[in-house]
Regions:
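Juxtamembrane transmembrane-helix termini in multi-pass membrane transport proteins
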Residues: 1-34
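Transmembrane helix boundary and interhelical junction motifs in multipass membrane proteins
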Residues: 1-4, 111-123
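Interfacial segments of multi-pass membrane proteins
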Residues: 5-14, 18, 120-135
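Transmembrane-helix boundary and interhelical-loop signature of multi-pass inner-membrane proteins
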Residues: 38-56, 126-127, 149-181, 194-195
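Alpha-helical multi-pass membrane helix bundles of inner-membrane/thylakoid proteins
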Residues: 49-60, 64-112, 159-177
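Short alpha-helical packing/oligomerization segments
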Residues: 131-152
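Juxtamembrane boundary at the C-terminal end of a transmembrane helix
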Residues: 189-201
Length: 201
């Protein structure tokens, strides 16, 4: 998808890249906000004294650790996920802004397409643990915006050479991004475990 929606590709389809990308970013942010809000509302259905009990916080920490193990495919395990991705047949069939809005919303929600990292599930777990609608919405908003960043990075891609250069940079940066995600999950799991154990107490 990243290779398909670029100034170079959109120009060939007589579409405006900035409009497609704006629709993509806004709908990804909205999708993330909605799923974060929904997770927080579901979490709020559980009494706070249970959510923030040592058992509740410990369960959240365990889920983050489980996500790390699944990401690493320990014992041949795999992260549970849908087997579907956004429908690239939309490109060329619909107007650019429709494609941008449709793709952005699906990727912003995160769990309706292929889930490649447990960080997606971690956002839902943390939003539910908080149980506060505005915090959940904010977590989801940040998630949706971060998901949209790679497409924004296509700005300035006006020929094949520039497109391949960006794709090479993305490929080269993927291992570092994976490490950052795993460190973040580990830090979050450690903080939750510390809280569940009562800190220094």
């Amino acid at each position: 998808m990243l290779a398909s929606i670029s100034p170079f590709g959109e120009r060939a389809r007589a579409s405006r890249w900035w409009l497609t990308t704006t629709a993509y970013v806004l709908s990804s942010a909205l999708g993330g906000t909605l799923v974060g809000l929904l997770s927080a509302l579901l979490g709020a259905a559980v009494p706070e004294r249970w959510r923030w009990s040592p058992a509740g916080v410990g369960l959240a920490a365990a889920l983050l650790v489980l996500g790390l193990l699944l990401d690493a495919r320990v014992g041949g395990s795999r992260l549970p996920s849908w087997r579907r991705q956004v429908d690239e047949a939309w490109i060329g069939r619909y107007r650019g802004w429709v494609v941008g809005a449709g793709f952005g919303a699906q990727l912003g929600v995160g769990v309706v397409t292929i889930v490649t990292s447990s960080t997606t599930y971690a956002v839902l777990v943390l939003a539910a643990l908080g149980g506060t609608p505005w915090v959940g919405a904010l977590l989801g908003l940040v998630f949706g915006l971060v998901r949209a960043l790679p497409l924004v990075g296509m700005v300035g891609v006006h020929d094949r050479e520039a497109l391949w250069a960006v794709l090479r940079r993305v490929e080269l940066g993927a291992p570092a991004a994976e490490v950052v995600a795993r460190v973040g999950l580990l830090a979050g799991a450690s903080a939750l475990a510390w809280t569940a154990l009562g800190g220094v107490a």
